[in-house]
């Protein structure tokens, strides 16, 4: 809570690059712009911004070093469905724009359906199922089905398929 939005994104640049201060500032602005954070929020602290904005700051920090891989651990936890969808779309667009491989750990089936391509289902530390989101509804894996179809909407979708 002691580092501003701007400082949060600058942190990996300070730690792992020899960029000039001007170059760092330009990169910070670039990253924050890409996650739709306006300059007036740069000096704010985490306690002064919404949960959705905090997630976007974390994503901006994650892309600051222009990684090949983006790892997201429960990127939608604590967010309302509308904001979660915004975060999913943001991750999806950044993945394409920066040509990164993105790995998302989530319990949110909406996210899996929204942005998943290859899906790995793990239960109690064991790989249970691997496939595409298109194959999920027709999976014969009982543990996967129990997890997914606890939601009545998905259960109705399965009956219809």
Predicted regions span which residues?
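Conserved ABC ATPase signature
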Residues: 45-49, 53
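Helix N-cap at the start of a conserved alpha-helix in ABC-type nucleotide-binding domains
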Residues: 81-83
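Conserved ABC ATPase "signature" region
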Residues: 22-40
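Conserved catalytic motifs of ABC-family nucleotide-binding domains
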Residues: 66
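Short helical segment in ABC ATPase nucleotide-binding domains corresponding to the A-loop/adjacent helical element
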Residues: 6-14, 25
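Catalytic Walker B motif of ABC-type/P-loop ATPase nucleotide-binding domains
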Residues: 70-73
């Amino acid at each position: 809570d002691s580092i501003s939005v701007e400082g949060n994104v600058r942190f990996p640049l300070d730690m792992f690059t020899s960029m000039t201060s001007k170059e760092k500032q330009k990169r910070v602005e670039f990253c924050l712009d890409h996650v739709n954070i306006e300059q007036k929020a740069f000096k704010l602290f985490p306690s002064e911004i919404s949960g959705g904005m905090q997630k976007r700051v974390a994503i901006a920090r994650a892309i600051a070093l222009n990684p090949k891989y983006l790892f997201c651990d429960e990127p939608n936890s604590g967010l309302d469905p509308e904001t979660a969808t915004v975060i999913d779309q943001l991750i999806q667009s950044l993945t394409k724009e920066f040509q990164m491989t993105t790995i998302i750990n989530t319990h949110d089936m909406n996210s899996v359906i929204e942005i998943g391509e290859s899906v790995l289902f793990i239960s109690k530390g064991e790989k249970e199922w691997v496939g595409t989101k298109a194959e999920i509804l027709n999976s014969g894996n009982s543990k996967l089905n129990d997890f997914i179809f606890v939601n009545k909407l998905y259960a109705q979708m399965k009956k219809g398929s």
